[in-house]
């Protein structure tokens, strides 16, 4: 669990996981995630077995919902893993009233999801809230119009990489070179 230098702001969303960005699409929010139904921005991060598997809060706020769902153990890098695999949902409400969803998804090898946060807890941005063992995935659900600051294929660092800007002031990145 390496130390991280987390940007502290009221509107930036940092990566909750270390790994490769799989998706930054707009799609229907899962029905079992306690957010209003409709189109939301999903940013998916895949952690391979060599990545740090500690999960960190992408924003500061109060945990308002959690839910565990049993499921399959498909390869976490495929799209249907988001709804078919074992997963742990968490919804965080920011001071602004904006809610975001964070979903820990077990992978082919990972069969142990640990959520350390509970409903009513306050999380600081970058604070450890859980861990997933071995290859797995974390999906972050944001309002559909949220501009993203990462590209598919880019490597994200948990607690440090800025995924998005909820203030709407940052321009969305649509192309570029990723490491």
Please tell me what each predicted stretch does:
Residues 1-179:
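Contiguous, well-folded functional domains in the mature portion of proteins
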């Amino acid at each position: 669990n390496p130390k991280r230098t987390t940007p502290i702001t009221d509107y930036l969303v940092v990566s909750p996981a270390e790994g490769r960005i799989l998706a930054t699409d707009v799609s229907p929010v899962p029905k079992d995630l306690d957010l209003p139904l409709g189109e939301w921005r999903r940013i998916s991060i895949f952690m391979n077995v060599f990545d740090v598997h500690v999960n960190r809060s992408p924003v500061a706020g109060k945990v308002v919902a959690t839910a565990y769902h049993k499921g399959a153990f498909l390869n976490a890098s495929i799209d249907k893993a988001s709804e078919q695999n074992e997963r742990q949902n968490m919804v965080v409400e920011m001071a602004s009233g904006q809610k975001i969803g964070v979903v820990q998804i077990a992978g082919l090898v990972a069969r142990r999801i640990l959520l350390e946060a509970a409903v009513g807890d306050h999380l600081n941005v970058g604070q450890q809230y859980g861990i997933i063992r071995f290859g797995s995935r974390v999906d972050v659900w944001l309002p559909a119009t949220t501009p993203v600051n990462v590209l598919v294929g880019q490597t994200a660092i948990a607690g440090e990489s800025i995924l998005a800007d909820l203030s709407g002031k940052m321009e969305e990145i649509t192309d570029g070179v990723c490491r």
